[in-house]
Amino acid sequence: MSGASRRLVHCTLPPELVHQPILHGLVRASTAVVNVRRANVDVEAGVAWFLLELAGPPAELERAEAWLTERGVTVEPIGR
């Protein structure tokens, strides 16, 4: 992957998105490589978060983060 960057982001889903296929949508909408490093989902409590490693051209990583944010996911970069 020439010109590729890697970025860790912590994503928190609001209760209304816990049942939605957010990662599926992200993978279909973006060419960034998405790797789930850690996750916690409690469907009954309506709580979900995941730590993603995104890889690809910097512009594509920004696009992936924007896609998540536009859908209501809180995205926090780790170690930028």
Q: What are the residue ranges of the model-derived segments?
A:
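Long, contiguous binding/interaction regions
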Residues: 1-80
